[in-house]
Amino acid sequence: MTISTVIAFMSMFLVFVMSGPIVVEGRAFFVFGDSLVDSGNNNYLVTTARADSPPYGIDFPTRRPTGRFSNGLNIPDLISEAIGNEEPPLPYLSPELRGRSLLNGANFASAGIGILNDTGFQFINIIRMYQQLDYFQQYQQRVSRLIGKPQTQRLVSQALVLITVGGNDFVNNYFLFPYSARSRQFTLPDYVRLLISEYKKILLRLNSLGVGRVLVTGAGPLGCAPAELARSGTSNGRCSAELQRAASLYDPQLLQMINELNKKIGRNVFIAANTNQMQEDFLSTPRRYGFVTSKVACCGQGPYNGMGLCTVLSNLCPNRELYVFWDAFHPTEKANRMIVRHILTGTTKYMNPMNLSSALAL
């Protein structure tokens, strides 16, 4: 053996000893869904559903847009913070998601998507739910090459999963315009049953991929977003009755489906978050929670600042802490913090069968 060969061998040995095996620390966090939880995947796609330009991110720690549909932190960021993770999971399409950063989890969410594949067609290129789940499978293969299959299975089974999807199936599909294809095909109750049936398939596939704890959020107060107030032409700020009816049909059936799945599986894999009720509290009495309005968006134009996109040319409020809505559809960071507080410690009025803190303590 030559001296150069010995030196090369010793160098490789020292690198191995110093670096050691990759150890999984903390709890991985995986995120699936739409713009409420997208942390930047759409930045890497040719799509109109983007939040990568100012003033998005105006209150983010870097003061720069990241692809989050928020003035600052979104719900995955705040949950990551609450469960003690140093960083929120990176977007799956981010080139920075490699090596050890994979062990923190990944965010697969994509703005504009819905439960149904035809939802959000107007946004062109988005990561639909089936593709998000395919990416999750791909993620597990990548991590297996890093830490081995048994460790990967353990990482996934002990991880927390958040899935937020369904609102776009109403706003950007059934009620997108009068006499939409889906509204001609289904009555609203039948359409809700279709969504629940398709959502059940998504959750069953997630379960088959080895996850152990899944937080499922409801539709939220769909008819109260500034975009819907502007669209309905209301002058008194009253929420859209048709969209509120949709949410009132959807959320109880979602909870029933989740309870049935847990019973079938034999343990509480799925946790339902009643985000409609959570937001109803500060939508109906905003001043009680330190807001000046729950109807006008901080950033936008037209009635209620609810028309079009939030851009550098839009009206922009000076203090985001006083607004429930950041743009035409999405809550401010302050509102997100209130939602996450309920998710973590809320009673059965908001969380079923238990809140997230109780679930993670099991």
UniProtKB/Swiss-Prot annotation:
- Please give the superkingdom of this protein's source: Eukaryota
Q: Where in the cell is it found?
A: Secreted
What InterPro entries is this protein classified in? GDSL (IPR001087), GDSL_Est/Lipase (IPR051058), SGNH_hydro_sf (IPR036514), SGNH_plant_lipase-like (IPR035669)
**What GO terms describe the biological role, i.e. biological process, of this protein?**
lipid catabolic process
The entry's active site is 35, 327, 330
Mention one GO molecular function: hydrolase activity, acting on ester bonds
Q: Signal peptide location in the record?
A: 1-19
**Recorded E.C. number(s)?**
3.1.1.-
Q: Indicate whether Isomerase appears among the record's keywords.
A: no
Residues modified by carbohydrate are: 117, 355
The UniProt keywords, alphabetically, are: Glycoprotein, Hydrolase, Lipid degradation, Lipid metabolism, Secreted, Signal
* Broad EC category: hydrolase
Q: Name one GO cellular component term.
A: extracellular region
Q: One Pfam family for this entry, by name?
A: Lipase_GDSL
PANTHER family with a match to the protein in the record: (RAPE) HYPOTHETICAL PROTEIN, GDSL LIPASE/ACYLHYDROLASE FAMILY PROTEIN (AFU_ORTHOLOGUE AFUA_4G14700)
Family membership: Belongs to the 'GDSL' lipolytic enzyme family.
Q: This protein is called what?
A: GDSL esterase/lipase At5g18430
Q: What is the lineage of its organism?
A: Eukaryota, Viridiplantae, Streptophyta, Embryophyta, Tracheophyta
